[in-house]
């Protein structure tokens, strides 16, 4: 990598030398100003000259619509101290100029220089950074808005003695930056400051890889320069460009006549009393118009920006004047830009937008002409923004469209996929997230050459606001579309409201109506605000933050009331309420969402269950099961309640305003009565806000005022978090008072302390009452920390903090006090979702969500197997699988001579051509993407913790090591699995049964080593002989529940779970009474399997035989790693912690490739092996006793399974009994604790029930998958690949496979801790790939093989036994013969060649022969065929998987470089390491993939190096790659340039884990 980087850098230096004059001509004066010396006064420049110069530079940029990059820049690190206030430029020779940009990233600052243009760079920790344009900021400090319109008294030059002094002031003045996630996918977008540079670089740009779609974000600064910057973060390139300059827009409005609403405080009071109830008094807004420059406001005050929680997208389709709302069904996306800016010549600027569900549409390449204007898709998108300056609020609309008649001169095509953007905007509210983290897109643009546009709508001027008062927080509600005011003129009405909070406690509520006429062509906006509400809090305090929580009375009643209600009536009202809450969805789409299956019972979003039939499993994945299982919190079908009471209650809307002051929190509860639509229409003449049901607040009643009354002035609140989805709820209080905890409030104080409050709702005499109480301290003392998205708290760690832990066990991070990382809780919740995700280290919340994710993945398999019309889809964007996927496989043509062409038919899967991907990443940002990173973050924290191990003395440590100590890379492996199962069956007896081909000699039996084949036999045997026992272990619970065999599984187990009879380990078929119909199905499936050419031993590794045992093991290991046996290896460094801990340690740079693994002591390793391979047999001393015991256990198995099934908590009849039994068990608390302690399990009752629920769902899903009616080979391939992908994801989340890239280069590749589960999944992948990829026309004839053997192979007998390897060598030989002459000319040692074996000799310098794509595909057929053959002989050669190696010549030293089937790297004799492609088994070197041959060890104990020359080729076959793909989830390198991959998989997703592939 260093060579590549240096090569690029040298070329770049030469280029920069040629163009240095052009680059630096416009910045000479500024370079002088930034010279780091004490002669600043002599080099000072006049302010007016700078201003004129800046204007001239802007004029030279052709027009204002040209976006400007800072550049594509390489970082250089500078020394910093804690607090980010110190800079040291002594080690650099750079000077600051207008092209430089300073970026602060956590504890590091990066200075970018234009001279390093297009060089690769590393950008660490982008989650929190400040973006400062140094020259702009400096010029701003000089000018301070000094222009004709805005006068400023301070017109002095700012002087700095050094650059450091300037940066001090810049950093102190800077605020955090708003960062938004991807808006649109960008391909090869580069803009340059200089036209000459662009012309000379255009040829180089064409070869730059495509930027990954996840790397596009928008950046908004809170600096006084008011910039909205676009930011594209790639692996190699960081792009900054200007999207919107708020300051320029603001100055453009100075001469406009704008609407000014004067807010004058009403002296008569804020309230009015009607019938004894207190209401907020409606106030009058005084409206006037005036020039903005005449408005008296203070520009020197700090300003801030607030945005609406959603954006609106409107669309007008071809030849249709009607505006269509954007629905949520995701379709394809496409946008192709064929025109570029005048300053960029011939640069490829294709922008392909890919939606969040991996949909890629066909390209539309027609060019736009003005006469085609009526045929294009017009779109209009906008968001509301408020700029707060002292006592003025400037209300802006920021919008974007593709209307070419409004001044945009660039070409435009069909706007990409509106539904996708609309879906993104609905999911997030950027104002509710920390400002230093990634945000959702608030703005989006169709074409990056189009600026966002801004329009000042009005100004709110607060007349009576005191000089010391100012706005501290503003909340803008969601923008909602109401109706057409005038359909002929396209006059549309949108409504929203604004809540403001001032420092002195004045709260204002404004109701705004936005009218937009002819939005696609004219963009005419009109804002109307007629009335507002306000009230005053205690002026003695200062108030900081304002947050809103809204509930309906119907929802509150469903939580608090204990009685039951009619489900059908409830369902109807609930659907109507949900449709009203989301205005952006059309009626037809909502009908599909809620009524896709009229015959099935619906599980509502308000904790309501309507049934448990078979269709229920499709509907019950995404509701709050925790609330559902609580007493009195569920509604059962066919039970009645007073309908009038429900109707009366649901007429109210409750709003809870949470206000935080210096030391206290205040909650104000408001209630408004909903008006009917007819009444709203009548009132529309008098008040514009009456049309908005959710905004209109006439008759707003104040119900309650609560305060925390904290008297401790030292507890200053720095932040508050509202957790609306609380896991821990006191059921006893609810049963007595019909009360319920609405939400939990967590106050974080500056001194590091935390205080929790709960806001309770109770129902008394038909009315709701609300209380704010202090939450009692929990026994676990868990800490809630809201860090939204996938940036964990791990990132602020550095060497200094970690070193401090040696003397102190406490760390203070983000004002959160942690101890040993044991009680860290990460809470992530999403708006309008019933259930939040609470992740912890030391209790069950984490394992529950882990199992929940498996349930969701299994549900996706069912959605692909069944017709979307037959199931009720929970996510509406998954509603139509055909629309989502059919274009992916429209052109899939399977060759006629394919071995499976007679079985796979087009449109076989219910007319849905589905690719072999589960779309795990691109759905909802909270479903899988962040979940993965959250798990990694917590796992890393836990790995660094020496749980209860550091406190032991030396003697106890030795005892602890011998008994319980497990190395971190052994705890996940199959060895620990054997430690689990040997508790239930005798290990020696297993070996005796499994190794049937070995004599019964005890001495020989002890020498048997575990291999992959024996491992498969063991887990088969364990699965068929494991029985229920009264053990309260997690593994026991999961296994027995998933293993329950009901009537649905008879056919499945009979067909697919046949085990080799030689081992006497077949299933007990006594209970599988199969009828005649099922027998016919069995015969049909057997014929299909024979015709499909499933090779001999595929049934041995079939993943569907091991799904139960895999699920159980993975769940258990996850629970095991996080709860019971904390990993005590402090030397293990994960992929995250490596960059945080070891960056200054030079000794790791050469010794390790990425991360080192702990060295294992030989004594310790031998002890572990002895413990594994030797197990005392107490219960099973002989074969007879063992068989008798096994028969007795099998006879009792079904009874125990039935009992467990009856006791499942989802059973409606036994739920109350279980709850009562739980209460009884509480009385015997001491006995329960003793029993739990004996089994190392301490579980909370509610979380245990919830965990059981998801395990139950997994069982239901697997039953449906296994009993799918379509027993065709295609369906089997789909199911098996999907299951492999699920298990592969789980394995990587757990890091069970320790064969990743974090390896020690001195580590023996054969001694790597092979996880046989990992190998089992990989072999399933490769076997299934072989079935898909096999094509007989590429297979070489046997005659060619024989000829090759006679000519080139000395040991003919041995090699002739493996014809597939000979076919591969013959393939190499044919290519060699075609390129032989060229190789001989270039070979310096050609005189030493052996004429007999031209290609089988060791050359002093390796040579590479390039091949094309057809040869690569032939190679894939051959290499997969060899792997298939090796799997077929696993019974005859039990160690074949350990003996199989891939080999090439090292590209550096020409030594032999090898890898095995399960490692993802190559290593040579000189410890040179190269990446390996897990799909083609090739070695990735630079921009090529080197194709290996197969090498088999004769004996597993033989030395790997050196390899005899007879097995070494003198050259490598290489294939040039356009791009190299890297999966950031499973750390595998994937090369996808072959037709096979394009046929059966999504091109930009990893086939193993479905994660999006990044381009290196």
Curated annotation (Swiss-Prot):
Task: Please list the residue ranges that the record marks as compositionally biased, kind Acidic residues.
Answer: 15-28
Please report the record's description of how this protein sits within the membrane. Multi-pass membrane protein
Highest rank taxon of the organism = Eukaryota
**What is the predominant subcellular site recorded for this chain?**
membrane
Q: Which GO terms describe its cellular component?
A: membrane
Per the record, where are the segments of Low complexity compositional bias?
583-594
What ranges does the record give for the region Disordered, renumbered to this chain?
1-46, 568-594
From the UniProt record, list the coiled-coil ranges: 36-60, 317-359, 1188-1239
Basic and acidic residues compositional bias: what residue ranges? Answer: 29-46
Use case: Possible candidate for an effective malaria vaccine as determined by epitope response in sera.
**Where is this chain's protein located in or outside the cell?**
Membrane
What is this protein's name? Uncharacterized protein PF3D7_1223600
């Amino acid at each position: 990598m260093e060579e590549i980087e240096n090569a690029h850098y040298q070329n770049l230096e030469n280029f920069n030398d040629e163009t240095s004059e052009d680059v630096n001509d416009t910045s000479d004066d500024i370079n002088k100003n930034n010279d780091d010396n004490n002669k600043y006064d002599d080099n000072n420049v006049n302010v007016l000259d700078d201003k004129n110069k800046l204007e001239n530079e802007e004029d030279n940029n052709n027009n204002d619509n040209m976006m400007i990059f800072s550049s594509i820049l390489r970082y250089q690190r500078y020394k910093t101290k804690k607090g980010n206030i110190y800079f040291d430029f002594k080690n650099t020779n750079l000077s600051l100029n207008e092209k430089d940009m300073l970026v602060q990233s956590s504890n590091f600052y990066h200075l970018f220089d234009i001279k390093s243009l297009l060089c690769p760079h590393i950008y660490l920790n982008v989650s929190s950074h400040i973006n400062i344009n140094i020259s702009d900021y400096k010029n701003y400090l000089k000018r301070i808005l000094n222009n004709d319109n805005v006068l400023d008294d301070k017109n002095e030059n700012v002087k700095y003695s050094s650059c450091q002094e300037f940066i001090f002031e810049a950093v102190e003045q800077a605020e955090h930056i708003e960062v938004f996630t991807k808006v649109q996918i960008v391909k090869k977008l580069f803009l340059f400051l200089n036209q000459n540079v662009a012309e000379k670089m255009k040829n180089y740009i064409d070869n730059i890889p495509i930027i990954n779609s996840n790397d596009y974000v928008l950046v908004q600064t809170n600096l006084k320069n008011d910039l909205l910057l676009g930011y594209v973060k790639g692996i190699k390139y960081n792009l900054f460009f200007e999207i919107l300059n708020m300051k320029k827009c603001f100055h453009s409005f100075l001469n406009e006549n704008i609407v000014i609403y004067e807010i004058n405080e009403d002296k008569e009071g804020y309230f009015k009393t009607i019938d004894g109830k207190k209401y907020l008094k409606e106030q009058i807004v005084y409206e006037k118009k005036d020039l903005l420059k005449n408005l008296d406001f203070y520009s020197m005050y700090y300003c801030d920006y607030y945005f609406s929680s959603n954006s609106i997208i409107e669309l007008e389709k071809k030849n249709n004047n009607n505006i269509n709302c954007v629905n949520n069904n995701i379709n394809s996306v496409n946008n192709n830009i064929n025109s570029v800016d005048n300053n960029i010549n011939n640069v490829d600027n294709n922008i392909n937008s890919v939606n969040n569900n991996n949909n890629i549409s066909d390209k539309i390449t027609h060019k736009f002409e003005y006469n085609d204007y009526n045929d294009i898709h017009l779109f209009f998108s906008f968001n509301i923004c408020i700029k707060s300056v002292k006592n003025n609020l400037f209300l802006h609309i920021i919008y974007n469209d593709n209307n070419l008649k409004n001044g945009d001169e660039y070409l435009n095509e069909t706007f990409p996929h509106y539904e996708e953007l609309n879906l993104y905007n609905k999911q997030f509210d950027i104002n509710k997230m920390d400002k230093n983290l990634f945000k959702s897109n608030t703005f989006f643009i169709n074409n990056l050459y189009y600026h966002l546009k801004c329009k000042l709508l009005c100004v709110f001027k607060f007349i009576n606001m005191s000089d010391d008062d100012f706005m501290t927080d503003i909340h803008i509600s969601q923008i909602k579309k109401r109706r057409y005011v005038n359909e002929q003129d396209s006059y549309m009405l949108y409504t929203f409201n604004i809540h403001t909070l001032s420092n002195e406690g004045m709260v204002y509520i404004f109701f705004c109506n936005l009218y937009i006429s002819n939005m696609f062509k004219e963009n005419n906006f009109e804002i109307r605000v007629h009335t507002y509400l306000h009230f005053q809090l205690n002026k003695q305090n200062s108030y900081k933050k304002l947050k809103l929580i809204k509930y309906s009375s119907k929802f509150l009643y469903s939580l608090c009331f204990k009685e039951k209600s009619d489900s059908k009536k409830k369902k109807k009202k609930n659907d109507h309420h949900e449709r009203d809450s989301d205005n952006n969805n059309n009626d037809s789409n909502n009908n599909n969402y809620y009524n896709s299956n009229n015959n099935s019972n619906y599980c509502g979003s308000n904790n309501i269950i309507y049934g448990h039939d078979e269709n229920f499993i499709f509907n019950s994945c995404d509701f709050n099961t925790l609330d559902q299982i609580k007493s009195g919190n569920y509604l059962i079908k066919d039970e009645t309640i007073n309908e009038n009471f429900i109707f009366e209650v649901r007429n109210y809307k409750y709003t809870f305003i949470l206000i935080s002051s210096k030391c206290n929190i205040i909650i104000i509860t408001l209630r408004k009565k909903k008006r009917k639509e007819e009444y709203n229409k009548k009132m529309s003449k008098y008040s514009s806000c009456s049309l908005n049901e959710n905004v209109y607040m006439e008759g707003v009643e104040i119900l309650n005022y609560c305060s925390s009354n904290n008297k401790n002035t030292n507890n200053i609140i720095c932040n508050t978090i509202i957790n609306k989805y609380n896991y821990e709820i006191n059921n006893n209080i609810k049963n007595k008072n019909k009360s319920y905890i609405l939400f939990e409030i967590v106050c974080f104080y500056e001194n590091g302390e935390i205080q929790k409050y709960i806001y309770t709702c109770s129902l008394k005499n038909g009315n709701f009452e609300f209380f704010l109480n202090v939450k009692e301290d929990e026994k676990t003392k868990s800490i809630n920390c809201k860090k939204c998205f996938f940036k964990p708290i791990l990132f602020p760690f550095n060497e200094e903090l970690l070193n401090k832990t040696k003397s102190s066990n406490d760390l203070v991070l983000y004002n959160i006090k942690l101890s040993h990382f044991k009680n860290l809780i990460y809470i992530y919740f999403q708006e309008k979702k019933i259930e939040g995700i609470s992740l912890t280290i030391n209790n069950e919340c984490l394992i529950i969500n882990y199992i929940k994710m498996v349930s969701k993945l299994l549900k996706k398999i069912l959605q692909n197997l069944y017709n979307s019309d037959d199931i009720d889809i929970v996510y509406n964007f998954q509603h139509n699988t055909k629309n989502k996927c059919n274009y992916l496989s429209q052109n899939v043509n399977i060759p006629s001579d394919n071995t499976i062409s007679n079985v796979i038919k087009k449109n076989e899967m219910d007319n849905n051509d589905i690719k072999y991907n589960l779309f795990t990443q691109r759905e909802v940002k909270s479903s899988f993407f962040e979940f993965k990173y959250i798990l990694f973050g917590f796992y890393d924290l836990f790995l660094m913790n020496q749980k209860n191990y550091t406190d032991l003395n030396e003697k106890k440590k030795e005892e602890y090591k011998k008994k319980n100590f497990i190395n971190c890379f052994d705890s996940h492996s199959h060895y620990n699995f054997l430690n689990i199962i040997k508790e239930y069956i005798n290990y020696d007896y297993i070996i005796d049964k499994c190794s049937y081909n070995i004599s019964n000699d005890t001495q020989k039996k002890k020498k048997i080593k575990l291999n992959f084949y024996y491992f498969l036999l063991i887990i088969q045997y364990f699965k068929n002989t494991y029985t229920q026992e009264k053990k309260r272990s997690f593994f026991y619970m999961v296994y027995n529940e998933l293993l329950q065999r009901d009537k649905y599984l008879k056919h499945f187990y009979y067909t697919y779970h046949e085990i080799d009879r030689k081992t006497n380990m077949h299933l007990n078929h006594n209970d599988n009474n199969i009828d005649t119909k099922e027998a016919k199905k069995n015969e049909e499936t057997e014929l299909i399997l024979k015709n499909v050419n499933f090779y001999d031993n595929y049934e041995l590794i079939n993943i569907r035989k091991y799904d139960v045992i895999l699920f159980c093991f993975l769940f258990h290991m996850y629970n095991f790693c996080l709860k019971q046996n904390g990993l005590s290896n402090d030397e293990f460094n994960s992929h995250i912690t490596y960059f945080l801990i070891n960056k200054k340690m030079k000794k790791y740079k050469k010794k390790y490739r990425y991360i080192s693994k702990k060295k294992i002591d030989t004594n310790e390793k031998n002890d572990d092996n002895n413990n594994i391979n030797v197990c005392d047999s107490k219960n099973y001393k002989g074969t007879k006793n063992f068989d008798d015991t096994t028969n007795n256990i099998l006879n009792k198995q079904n009874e125990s399974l039935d009992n467990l099934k009856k006791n499942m908590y989802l059973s409606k009849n036994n739920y109350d009994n279980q709850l009562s039994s739980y209460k009884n068990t509480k009385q015997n608390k001491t006995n329960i604790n003793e029993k739990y302690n004996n089994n190392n399990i301490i579980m909370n009752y509610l979380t245990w029930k919830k965990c059981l629920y998801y395990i139950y769902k997994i069982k239901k899903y697997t039953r449906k998958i296994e009993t799918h009616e379509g027993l065709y080979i295609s369906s089997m391939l789909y199911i098996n690949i999907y299951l492999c992908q699920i298990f592969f994801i789980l394995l990587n989340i757990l890091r069970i496979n320790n064969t990743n890239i974090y390896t020690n280069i001195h580590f023996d590749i054969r001694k790597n801790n092979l996880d046989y589960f990992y190998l089992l999944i990989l072999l399933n992948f490769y076997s299934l790939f072989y079935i898909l990829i096999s094509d007989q026309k590429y297979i070489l004839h046997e005659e060619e093989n024989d000829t090759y053997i006679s000519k080139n192979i000395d040991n003919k007998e041995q090699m002739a036994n493996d014809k597939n390897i000979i076919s591969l060598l013959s393939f190499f030989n044919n290519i060699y013969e075609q390129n032989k002459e060229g190789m001989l000319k270039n070979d310096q040692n050609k005189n030493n060649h052996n004429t007999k074996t031209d290609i089988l000799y060791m050359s002093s310098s390796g040579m590479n022969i390039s091949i094309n794509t057809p040869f690569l595909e032939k190679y894939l057929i051959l290499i997969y065929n060899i792997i298939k053959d090796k799997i077929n002989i696993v019974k005859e050669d039990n160690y074949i998987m350990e003996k199989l190696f891939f080999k090439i010549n090292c590209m550096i030293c020409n030594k032999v470089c090898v890898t095995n089937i399960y490692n993802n790297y190559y290593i040579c004799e000189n410890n040179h390491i190269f990446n390996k492609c897990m799909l083609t088994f090739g070695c990735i070197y630079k921009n090529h993939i080197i194709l290996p041959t197969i090498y088999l060890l004769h004996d597993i104990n033989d030395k790997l190096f050196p390899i005899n020359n007879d097995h070494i080729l003198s050259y490598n076959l290489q294939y040039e790659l356009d791009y190299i793909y890297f999966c950031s989830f499973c750390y595998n390198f994937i090369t996808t340039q072959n037709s096979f991959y394009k046929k059966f998989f999504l091109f930009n997703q990893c086939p193993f884990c479905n994660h999006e592939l990044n381009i290196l």
